[in-house]
Amino acid sequence: MSIKGQVTSFAERVEIGERWAGGQSDREIALALQRPLPTIRKWRRRYQQEGRDGLISLMGRPATGALGQLRGEISDEILQMREVHAGWGPLTILTELKKDARFGGLRFPSRARIAAYLKHKQKVKKYEHHQELPEPPHPTLQRPHQEWEVDAQGKIAIAGVGSASIVNILDVFSHVKIDSLPCLRTTHANTQDYQLVLRRAFVGYGLPEQISLDHDSVFYDNQTASPFPTVLHLWLIALGIGVRFIHQTPPAEHARIKRHHQTVTQQALLGQTFAGQADLQKALTGRLLFLNTDYPSSALQGQAPFSAYPQAQQTQRPYRLEWERESLNLQRVYTYLAHGRWFRMTSSVGTFSLGAQRYNAGTKRARQTLDITFDPQTGELVCLPQKESTSFRLAVQGLSKEVLIGELDPLTTIPAYQLALPWSRQAWRESVLCLDLGDTTL
C-alpha cells in the first residue's frame, strides 16, 4: 500500500474512474492500485458526479506557497539540499535541517510541507501510469518452432577478431540451435543486427509462430511506464510473428538460451583464433550444424535435435528476402496498436515523444498528460488531454514498410545496388544479406 500523503497522477484517477465504471468496488480498486481506500473513494465520487472534469486536481496552497510562512533561509536550504542530493527525500531533508546550528530555535516545516514545497518547485520525480504492452500468453509448447528464444550473449573477447557480442537463437521445443551472429566492435547489438540474424534464421528455417525476448532496449522501451513498441517489435508483428516478453529473470525464464550461450562458447570459441569475421561466422555455423545433426542431447534421450524432430528442419511458413516487402502486413500492426494505451506529458511548448517519434500537440496543451490510444481505421493517434473533455487526433509517424524493413529495402527494390567494402557494420550486414538473395552477383 502506498504511503499516506502521496499524490495520485491524472492517469491513476482516470483508471480509478474506469475501473469503477467497469464494475469494480472501491476496495478492489484500492487493492489493484495500491492506494488508500479513502483516496479511491474520493476520486471515484468525483468521477461519478463530474466525469473526467472532476479528476483535475485543485490541490495546493494559496499564492504564498507551501512554505510561505517560513523564513527564506530555510526554503533556500531545502532547495539547495535537493539539488545537491537528488536522492534525499523530505524526511532526510527535515532531519538535516534540525541538525543545522544556523536554524536553532526556528520553527521547522513538517515532512508533508517539505514534500509539497519540493513538488511546487518541480523538484520531485514524475510518476507515470504503468501500462504493459499487449502480448500473447506464455504457451504450452507442443511442436517445433512454436517459440524461439532470442538473446545476445554480451561482450566477449575472441582471439583474432577482438571483442564481440554474439546473438543466438534457439527453438525451445526441439532444442534446435537456429543461428548465431557475431557483432564485432560493439557491446550492444542494435536493431539492424537483430534483423540480420533473424532474417538469416527465417531464410534457413522459415518463420516461427512466436518469439520471446527480454526487456533489452532494442526490444522494449524502458524509459517510460507506458512503452510504445519498438521498430523491431512492430517488424515482427507485421510479419505475423507473435512477440512475448519474459517477466521473470533467468533461470525462471530464458534458461535455455542462457545455457546455449555457454554451449556456443565452448563448442566454437574456446582455444580458437580466427582470421576475421567471415572465418568466425563459418566456425559458428559449422558447430551449430554439428550440434543439431550429430551431438547427442541429454534433454532428447541421447538424440540430436534433427534426429528427434526431423520436422524441425523447416517451419510451415517459408520465407525469402525477396518476399519480405509483400509479406509485411501493416494492418497487423494497426490491429496490435489498437489494444495499446499510452500516457505522455507534453513539454513547455506542447510537444511529446512516442515510439522515437516527435509530435506537437500545440502550446495550449503544454505541460499536460495526454491519454493516447490508436484508431486502426484511420491510422491516427487519439489524444485526450488532462484538462479537456474532447480528444484530438494526430497522424501516426514511422509506421511505413520502408521504416520497418530498414537496411534490406534498397537491396530488394533497386535494380543495381553497389555494395561497399565490408569495413563498417552496415556494409558487412548488407554483404551477408546478399548471400541469401536470389539473382545476386557479388
Model-derived features: positions:
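Short, Lys/Arg-enriched anionic-surface-contact patches
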Residues: 1-14, 65-72
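Short, amphipathic alpha-helical "recognition" segments used to contact nucleic acids or chromatin
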Residues: 8-24, 75-84
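Mobile-element integrase/transposase regions
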Residues: 68, 72-73, 116-178, 189-197, ...
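RNase H-like two-metal-ion nuclease catalytic core shared by retroviral integrases
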Residues: 213, 222-266, 277-280, 285
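C-terminal, beta-rich DNA-binding module of retroviral/retroelements integrases
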Residues: 292-442
